[in-house]
From Swiss-Prot:
Record-linked Gene3D superfamilies: PRC-barrel domain, RimM
Protein name as annotated: Ribosome maturation factor RimM
Originating gene: rimM
GO annotation (BP), single: rRNA processing
Subunit description: Binds ribosomal protein uS19.
Function: An accessory protein needed during the final step in the assembly of 30S ribosomal subunit, possibly for assembly of the head region. Essential for efficient processing of 16S rRNA. May be needed both before and after RbfA during the maturation of 16S rRNA. It has affinity for free ribosomal 30S subunits but not for 70S ribosomes.
């Protein structure tokens, strides 16, 4: 199964490098040279092999094998990048999940009151933070004191909010 790992937001320079906004976990692994990425463009699927990867001003900069100038890649601006969900170099530990498993889950308080749906995730260094869209947008830290149960199969998450978390 493929998961969306990013979006080509722009080109960079004239030698065919692209600026990618990642919305994936494990980008250091997924974007390494030699990795294959799928770009869906105008109802066609194109497989590219990563030739080089670096981070520049918060964006992931990729160059693909065989692409050496801006004209060969510019038409992909705005397109999404996909990769196989299960990657041979990624092992999930206990209580670890792919972002694609968490995004879209409905979050409930421990009294079964719905809060909203996870729409995005960002890393803080200490722990991930889930952006949950309900009546407002809430920032829910993925920590043991808050997140009590994750049911990937039913796409539900139960939390015990800390005081002030949902204000």
């Amino acid at each position: 199964m493929e998961v969306e790992v990013g979006q080509i937001v722009n080109t960079h320079g004239i030698k065919g490098e692209v600026k990618v906004k990642s919305n994936s976990d494990f980008t250091e692994t997924r974007f390494q040279p030699g990795e294959q990425l799928l770009v869906k463009h105008n109802n066609t699927e194109i497989v590219y092999t990563v030739d080089s990867y670096r981070i520049h001003k918060g964006f992931h900069m990729l160059r693909f094998e065989g692409i050496n100038n801006i004209n060969d890649i510019e038409h992909l601006k705005g397109d999404y990048i996909y990769q196989e969900r299960d990657h041979q170099d990624i092992e999930l530990g206990e209580h670890e999940y792919y972002y694609s498993d968490i995004i879209g889950c409905t979050v409930f308080k421990d009294d079964d009151t719905p809060i909203g749906r996870v729409i995005n995730i960002f890393e803080t260094g200490a722990n991930d933070v889930w952006i949950v869209k309900g009546e407002k947008e809430y920032l829910i830290p993925y920590i043991e004191d808050v997140v009590k149960d994750i049911d990937i199969e039913n796409k539900t998450i139960k939390i015990t909010p800390m005081e002030g978390l949902l204000d």
